[in-house]
Swiss-Prot record:
The gene is AFG3. One of its GO terms (cellular component) is mitochondrial inner boundary membrane. The chain crosses the membrane at residues 116-136, 224-244. Changing D634A: Does not affect maturation of CCP1. This is Mitochondrial inner membrane m-AAA protease component YTA10. Residues 137-223 are mitochondrial intermembrane. It comes from Saccharomyces cerevisiae (strain ATCC 204508 / S288c). Binds 1 zinc ion per subunit. Residues 67-101 are annotated as: Disordered.
């Protein structure tokens, strides 16, 4: 910084040579620009001055460049003097000097660049035009060809009889032609009528007879630039549009092969914005990084193998599938599979989002689809991946434009259908797509010949979660005690996270690393993983949210009711932890259960889950004179389960084997059943919930002392684990149905459980 300041202080002497003349030259040009002489005379004068000053100005610029370059080269590097004791110091001094030379060299190159010349040209041009069109004040010098005052005109010329003719130009400028010399003097007036009266008065005082008085002629004279004024807004607008277009079109393309920055070109809105990936790009993800979805990975790998070695399949008469659609819940790895395909394939891979086809301009979506497939065919064999295809692939005729108006989304979908399976279809272009909602896609898009394979990627089971954990644990700095048995660690974490997707697992691993760093721990331990899992499931601990004693006691008995019900119900999920620490958005307490990976739920399981959900409210009813609003989420879950049992699962004798599911995603104005049936459904739902409430009340009434024990322990510790529950209540009277839980979390389960209290349904 000091070096730059020292050089900058030495520069002004050279920089002054950039001016276009000293004070004497400025005083020569300025009166010419501001004078009221005829325009052609001003232009001739300016032309002469420009001719005389051109050589001088170019010489000054060249001398500035030479002096500035010498200053850069000869200026000593103060930081590098006297530091020759080591190679490291010498190298750093050389690099500093090189950086300074590059910095000043770029400055001198800028002054010689075309951009600087254009800027100076525009500045000088606008200055000249503004000066020519702007009235100016009086100037010193000879009276000819300059602006006078009316008093000067009267005393110097009119009273002496030196004026032969007077011209009133444009009703505000008076030009007086002198006798014999043909010179012209001028002055401005405010009103023509007042000027004529003043002329008559002066000539009356001079006793000039009417026949000898000076004739006054009125003329209209336009400036060479006056005709531009009506077109000036249009010129500025077109010039601005041209400048913006040049800037946008000249922006460099993306590194991944996409369009340029900004709008991607004002006249290129119909171009595809797909990004190109190949083996030269920075995509480092391969199929080794994908775990937990082996079947889907095998399906996608076949596309890559076919493009790499088509002869293996063609000799058997097989053809490559035209496309595959990946569907499943968010976070299950659909986009990750596409990235792995881009990293493994030796063919061009074009990636685009479905929303990039949707624009405000009509026809842009279809144009981009055509351009995308044209680009893919030019690089065939190639792969196209369209993420979130439901943005353009929704079923036609639903949710479209009203009144039969043109729907841009449908036009885009029609073009996509034609490109995938039409007259110009290429067998060498494979289309992959991802969506979270395959149920809303158009049937024509999902048929064989377009998307031949429908690959469903569900949330991973315990084995899939274990494989995903093994992938993510490799990059973490774990406690040496944990690295000795990675299979056991990954299995335990997989058991602790039922229902987690690949994205949830990656988030939990990252949260564990962040928690360890927050506590300045050198390694990540199992305690950090447990805290991270709780953070992902229940939210952040709200330690600053202080509850009153009554609120805390109410929350403790509420959670104790849930825990005791779950402990003594056969089909309840294994309890892992109960806490009354506020978490997340409004949650004052929570209980963590570990449900097994199951795909069928019996009627008895539904009823036991409803009993456990009502345990919090029933515990409040048994221990407090008034209940609280803490059970509103429990009621919501109970109502949903009871309603599903009656309307869609056939678990109600009065409704029978009928389905009235209202959650099919389609809006219906009229219900598919009568009012009488609706009343019957309401009564059946209420009956199931009442039965669950009655059974829960009987169960907790028989175990009031156990509820008190758990609640007091919660008030003392704020969080209790499964070991605390065993210490307080004894082992569960039922064998756990979760095999992974017994293997990784409860290896010493009791083989002879005690008799369980009865729970009527």
């Amino acid at each position: 910084m000091m070096m730059w300041q020292r050089y900058a202080r030495g520069a002004p002497r050279s920089l002054t040579s950039l001016s276009f003349g000293k004070a004497s030259r400025i005083s020569t040009v300025k009166p010419v620009l501001r004078s009221r002489m005829p325009v052609h005379q001003r232009l001739q004068t300016l032309s002469g001055l420009a001719t005389r000053n051109t050589i001088h100005r170019s010489t000054q610029i060249r001398s500035f460049h030479i002096s500035w370059t010498r200053l850069n080269e000869n200026r000593p590097n103060k930081e590098g003097e006297g530091k020759n004791n080591g190679n490291k110091d010498n190298n750093s001094n050389k690099e500093d000097g090189k950086d300074k030379r590059n910095e000043f060299g770029s400055l001198s190159e800028y002054f010689r660049s075309k951009e600087f010349a254009n800027t100076m040209f525009l500045t000088i041009g606008f200055t000249i035009i503004f000066t020519l069109l702007t009235p100016s004040s009086n100037n010193s010098g000879d009276d000819s060809n300059r602006v006078l005052t009316f008093q000067d005109f009267k005393t110097k010329y009119l009273e002496k009889g030196l004026v032969s003719k007077i011209y009133v130009v444009n009703k505000f400028l008076v030009e007086a032609e002198l006798v014999n010399t043909k010179q012209v003097v001028s002055f401005t007036i405010g009103s023509v009528d007042i000027f004529e009266e003043q002329m008559d008065q002066i000539q009356d005082l001079l006793n000039i007879p009417p026949r000898d008085r000076i004739p006054i002629k009125y003329i209209e004279r336009s400036s060479p630039f006056t005709f531009l004024f009506p077109f000036l807004p249009t010129i500025i607008l077109l010039g601005g549009l041209y400048f913006i277009t040049r800037k946008i079109n000249s922006s460099p393309p993306n590194a991944n092969g996409g369009g340029g920055g900004g709008l991607g070109g004002m006249f290129n809105v119909g171009k595809s914005r797909a990004k190109l990936f190949n083996k030269e790009t920075d995509i480092k993800i391969s199929f080794k990084n994908v775990a937990g979805c082996d079947e889907a990975k095998q399906e996608i790998m076949e596309f890559v193998h076919f493009l790499k070695n088509p002869g293996k399949y063609t000799k058997l008469g097989a053809k490559i599938p035209r496309g595959a659609i990946l569907s499943g819940p968010p976070g299950t790895g659909k986009t990750l599979l596409a990235k792995a395909t881009a990293g493994e394939a030796n063919v061009p891979f074009l990636s685009v989002s479905g929303s990039e086809f949707v624009e405000m301009f009509v026809g842009v979506g279809a144009s981009r689809v055509r351009d995308l497939f044209t680009q893919a065919r030019s690089m065939a064999p190639s792969i196209i991946f369209i993420d979130e295809i439901d943005a353009i692939g929704k079923e036609r005729g639903k949710g479209g434009a009203l009144g039969g108006a043109n729907d841009e989304r449908e036009a885009t979908l029609n073009q996509l259908l034609v490109e995938m399976d039409g007259f110009t279809t290429s067998d060498q272009v494979v289309v992959l797509a991802g969506t979270n909602r395959p149920d809303v896609l158009d049937n024509a898009l999902m048929r064989p010949g377009r998307f031949d394979r429908h690959i469903q990627i569900d949330s991973p089971d315990v084995n899939g979660r274990q494989q995903i954990y093994l992938v993510h644990l490799k990059r973490l700095n774990l406690d040496p005690l944990l690295t000795d048995d990675m299979n056991n660690l990954s299995g335990k974490l997989a058991t602790l996270t039922p229902g987690f997707t690949g994205a949830d697992i990656a988030n939990a691993c990252n949260e564990a690393a962040l928690i360890a760093a927050r506590h300045n721990d050198p390694y990540i331990t199992i305690h950090h993983f447990e805290q991270a899992i709780e953070r992902v499931i229940a939210g952040l601990e709200k330690k600053t949210r202080v509850l009153s004693k009554e609120e805390k006691r109410s929350v403790a008995y509420h959670e104790a009711g849930h825990a005791v019900c779950g402990w003594f119900l056969k089909y309840a999920d294994p309890l892992l932890k109960v806490s009354i620490i506020p978490r997340g958005q409004g949650a004052l307490g929570y209980a963590q259960y570990l449900p097994p990976d199951q795909y069928l739920i019996s009627e008895e399981q539904f009823r036991h889950r409803m009993i456990m959900a009502l345990g919090g409210r029933v515990s409040e009813e048994l221990h407090f004179p008034s209940v609280t609003s803490g059970a509103h989420d429990d009621f919501k879950k109970v109502t949903q389960m009871a309603n599903a049992m009656v309307t869609s699962l056939g678990m109600s004798p009065k409704i029978g084997y009928l389905s009235f599911d209202q959650n099919d995603g389609n809006f219906k104005v009229n219900k598919p059943f009568s009012n009488k049936t609706a009343r019957t459904i309401d009564l059946e739902v209420k009956s199931i919930v009442d039965d669950a409430h009655r059974a829960c009340t009987e169960l907790l009434t028989k175990n009031l002392d156990k509820v008190d024990l758990v609640a007091k322990e919660l008030l003392r510790k704020e969080a209790i684990t499964r070991e605390d529950m065993i210490r307080l209540l004894g082992p569960r009277p039922f064998k756990e149905r979760n095999e992974a839980f017994e293997k990784y979390l409860d290896p010493k389960s009791n083989t002879e459980p005690p008799e369980a209290p009865a729970a009527t349904n």
